[in-house]
Amino acid sequence: MVIFSRSFLALSTTLIILALCINSSTMAQETEDLNSHSSSNSSTANKLPNDDGAWNEHAVKNPEEVAAMVDMKIKNSTERRRLGFFSCATGNPIDDCWRCDRNWHLRRKRLANCAIGFGRNAIGGRDGRYYVVTDPSDHDAVNPRPGTLRHAVIQDRPLWIVFKRDMVITLTQELIMNSFKTIDGRGVNVAIAGGACITIQYVTNIIIHGINVHDCRRTGNAMVRSSPSHYGWRTMADGDAISIFGSSHIWIDHNSLSNCADGLIDAIMGSTAITISNNYMTHHNEVMLMGHSDSYTRDKLMQVTIAYNHFGEGLIQRMPRCRHGYFHVVNNDYTHWVMYAIGGSANPTINSQGNRFLAPGNPFAKEVTKRVGSWQGEWKQWNWRSQGDLMLNGAYFTKSGAAAPASYARASSLGAKPASVVSMLTYSSGALKCRIGMRC
């Protein structure tokens, strides 16, 4: 076995060297872009932290020790051996796409190539410059100060938005995003909390990654700027953490969301091509609403992937609650609910695959599903299926409609992994604590 381990180590090392050789020019180009695309604008004149010399606490100096570690992982983890993981991989295709790279901070935009599901084509600000947020204030929603998050998100050009340091941003009014933007909180601790939160309205190509959003409040009846050339009157906002309204190609990944006035993530009014992944959601009532109303038929075109999320303590219902449309709910970990986990009305197609459902102790709340405001003669025709889900503590999923795979083609966006590995796939859900110069 030692001979095998050394061979495995040598092969892994060779592959890594080849990958570094192939990508060295790309890495150099993006590093130059990161450090040189600063202008006189105070928001972009600050380079990102760069600490290539940081000691990697996971490094091992002794090659024999490395071989022994690899050998142990191969022998002790049946699932990892079967799926062919490397030592830093988890089987989560999003995380494995970028988190093994200790130089992630030098090539942040590669994250845009890692999306899966219906929102996989969301590129955010990949093709634009970096914008470094230096100022957590939000004193003027009409004339935002350069260097603030509000000033960044309203720009007409693509931008990859990062943060100079840890900060808590308390928004006075909705943060109305313009198209082709990425909010990237990796490497620092960023929270949007205690005020208004994020609105994605009639735009496209948005990535929100690595931030904390909590304690959002209702705001409005005020003027708010949405682009450099336009501002207007906003009525009262519901107080969602993230509100998606008439928008497409949206990716919400690795955020920690909790305790807001209305929903944590709502997608309505014809929104589609959305992936909600790797988020950690806690302490909230109505978690996710997908679809505006039973009568709003434009939502029949909605396609949403909900994958690798952890629905945690203090959640009550709507994980999600769907209307019309097509919803792929795959490899999520449901550890808490009070009323139900997945609900819907108006004939949505729900494809539940490879999830883990841990029912609450209440004997009257064991059912995963809820048909809202519908009688059985109506909902028995709706296509809701459970395939490969793991039901714990008496949890059960009430299926309906067709069983044929073809009926779920428009609600299928990626291959589901076994529910037995969900704990590993979702272990790092929520905003990550990434350190510059180390694997995240």
Swiss-Prot record:
Active site (catalytic residues): 318
InterPro entries named among the record's database cross-references: AmbAllergen, Pec_lyase, Pectin_lyas_fold, Pectin_lyase_fold/virulence, PEL
Catalytic activity from the UniProt record: Eliminative cleavage of (1->4)-alpha-D-galacturonan to give oligosaccharides with 4-deoxy-alpha-D-galact-4-enuronosyl groups at their non-reducing ends
Disulfide bridge positions per record: none
Cofactor, free-text remark: Binds 1 Ca(2+) ion. Required for its activity.
GO molecular function terms attached to this record: metal ion binding; pectate lyase activity
UniProt xrefs under SUPFAM superfamilies: Pectin lyase-like (SSF51126)
Gene3D superfamilies named in the record: Single-stranded right-handed beta-helix, Pectin lyase-like
Pathway connected to this protein: Glycan metabolism; pectin degradation; 2-dehydro-3-deoxy-D-gluconate from pectin: step 2/5
Entry EC number(s): 4.2.2.2
Required co-factors: Ca(2+)
Residue ranges of the TM segments: none
Region (Disordered): 32-56
Positions of glycan attachment: 41, 76
Biological process according to GO: pectin catabolic process
Signal peptide location: 1-28
Keywords: Calcium, Glycoprotein, Lyase, Metal-binding, Signal
Sequence positions that bind Ca(2+): 238, 262, 266
Record-stated family: Belongs to the polysaccharide lyase 1 family.
Protein name listed in UniProt: Probable pectate lyase 10
